[in-house]
Amino acid sequence: MNEQEFLAAMASADVIHDQAAIDAALDRMASELDALVGGGPIVYAVVLTGGLVVAGQLATRLRCELDFDYVHVSRYRGETQGSDRLDWICGPRLDWRDRDVVLVDDILDEGHTLSALIDAAHQRGARSVRLVTLCEKLHDRRVANLHADVVGLTVPDRFVFGYGMDAYERGRQLPGIYALAEG
């Protein structure tokens, strides 16, 4: 998608959540996560690239001690539908053995990527693994028994972007959550 096509898609996109709704959700998420993990320290692992915006904004609201880490995996590679293949671009840099790990991502959709990351965290010896997502998509296609421990907002079963989520690798920096026009 070139710049003109993205701007056209943006012009017809629906606003799902504005910045005020996101800020309120992040405040609530921080309180919930602080209550779940106590004082820390926790491994605060950002799921790149989508989780970057959310994790940064959420971190400034947390009171617990954070040891920052990141993982970079992808099933999408610029497409709107994920493949069955999980590409590990960069694994964690910290040792997760006997640590409480919190994975932070932009959205819980079907959950294949996040489920694989949770399994990988357990294989690396994590004492506990929590999942935090800004958004949870409302549908019935999720991986069985997968849920986020902390969720900020729900979004409809549409292609959403903004606040870390992209539409054809564009729009991650937008200060709201949008959905591509249907049809």
Give the positions of each predicted feature.
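PRPP-associated nucleotide enzymes
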Residues: 1-183
